[in-house]
Amino acid sequence: VECCYGKQTYSGEYSDAHELQIGLTLMQKVLIELNKLGLPITFMAVPGNHGENRKNGKSYTDFMDNKDIAVAWYVENAFQYDKKLYKQFKFIYPNHVEDDITLTYASNGNLLGFAHGHQFRSGGGTLALGKAQAWHKNQKYGDWEVGFANILNYGHFHHFSILEDPQLIIGAPALDGGSKWIEQTHGKRTHAGILSYTIDKGGANNIYIAKKKSHKDFG
């Protein structure tokens, strides 16, 4: 959800309601298309900073009061009315007030970790990968499950990044076609893109970025 900060008031193209409708429609269409492959599908979602319920630009409720999680729930709830379709999917996302804002998922001998990335607040310098690595180390030090992931996935910073040192840390690109904030604070040009990769016992393979000059090129 955009326009959740004061400086974005006049830069958003859509209202809050329309953004939720677009997100919901996009998720549903992607899942329906993936279902045509005839493979079991696991849908996972974690809350990010733009989904937070805000007042005067500040989050003031709990971590699960988040539009990112709400949209995930809307998608699952809609699919439940088609039992034949619903059984093809597994939905995983935090929803209880006591849940963590990260997820882990075991696949082919790997433990995948998922975090939006807004919680990478300190340590590791100014680059996103350094912040992600410092955060990941601290999670392991605190004995949190996501800290033991050998493949950590995050977003938030809009551009693709990757580090293997020795755990694999992957920053996914965004579809928005650019973030003025990231460009001005990190010097990174953020191109619209979709990240995909495969998993086997050896880890992540076939890492691919479907990248275009603009999100409009994905139509």
Each model region followed by its residue ranges:
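Core catalytic region of metal-dependent phosphoesterases/phosphodiesterases
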Residues: 1-81
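Charged interaction patches that mediate protein-protein contacts
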Residues: 2-9, 207-219
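Catalytic phosphate/metal-binding cores of nucleic-acid and nucleotide-processing enzymes, i.e., regions
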Residues: 21-24, 43, 105, 213-219
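Conserved beta-sheet core of the metallophosphoesterase superfamily
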Residues: 35, 64-99, 108-210
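Acidic carboxylate-rich catalytic motifs and surrounding loops in phosphoryl-/glycosyl-chemistry enzymes
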Residues: 40-49, 89-101
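Short, solvent-exposed polar/charged micro-motifs at secondary-structure junctions
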Residues: 54-55, 102-107
